[in-house]
């Protein structure tokens, strides 16, 4: 059996998958925030419960936000303070007496989608998350591409390209990002960025779901906003595609539930690509909340 953990700032979610990659059982517990020992205990107790339930010693994979393993073997995960700065993989491997695999949660999302039966035909799969932030991962022949610093796929921290500023207006504000830089595309293309753009142009503070509801009702202002957002997304994604040239782009995160993102994006891309470039297939993520657990479990299938 394959155990996949999706660990975030508020919850530890475990999914158990069989050899056919089907989910057999899942459980969630709160993430301990202050004690590393309590954090390790929470993970180990879930593993012990799964071992007992299925009568086996399952493999363990973990997806977690941040850099899963720095050069000295420690984890950097600001959203999981109890474990950040600790040798998490080594400690869990020792306590569980088995090989523990660890990767960035966005890579696990992308891996989950790349291993979907419909998508395994594509050699290079790009996962793009449009949620609280903007991120993603790259999967080549079923394996994550991590890079030297584990930052492959940090698309949200690319800066707005010149074409975007020309389109939006040269007086368009370059917002300061949590990373310390200005103009990162995450501040405009995330769910929060989607709402910020609406407020910037129409001086009305509305959350993304309400804007989308207005769009569905035919509201002209909301429709103009969505057109502008999609144009901005196409400019930024065009830069990424020129570098990566994937066969498939799978979009996840809260904004992926908005059909216009996947149905109207492809037609906007060609003018932002080289003439010889082919627009990749663009699809909405298939596995929803289970994607992180699923991808983490499949880390043991990438050998």
Swiss-Prot record:
Pathway as given in its UniProt record: Cell wall biogenesis; peptidoglycan recycling
Enzyme class: transferase
Residues bound to Zn(2+): 157, 177, 179, 184
Record-linked SUPFAM superfamilies: Actin-like ATPase domain
Binding positions for ATP per the UniProt entry: 4-11, 133-140
GO MF, any single term: ATP binding
InterPro entries referenced in this protein's UniProt entry, alphabetically: ATPase_NBD, N-acetyl-D-glucosamine_kinase, ROK, ROK_cs
Catalytic activity, reaction form: N-acetyl-D-glucosamine + ATP = N-acetyl-D-glucosamine 6-phosphate + ADP + H(+)
Entry annotated with the keyword ATP-binding: yes
NCBIfam families according to UniProt: PRK13310.1 (NF009835)
Described function: Catalyzes the phosphorylation of N-acetyl-D-glucosamine (GlcNAc) derived from cell-wall degradation, yielding GlcNAc-6-P.
Family statement: Belongs to the ROK (NagC/XylR) family. NagK subfamily.
PANTHER family in the record: N-ACETYL-D-GLUCOSAMINE KINASE, ROK (REPRESSOR, ORF, KINASE) FAMILY
Protein name per Swiss-Prot or TrEMBL: N-acetyl-D-glucosamine kinase
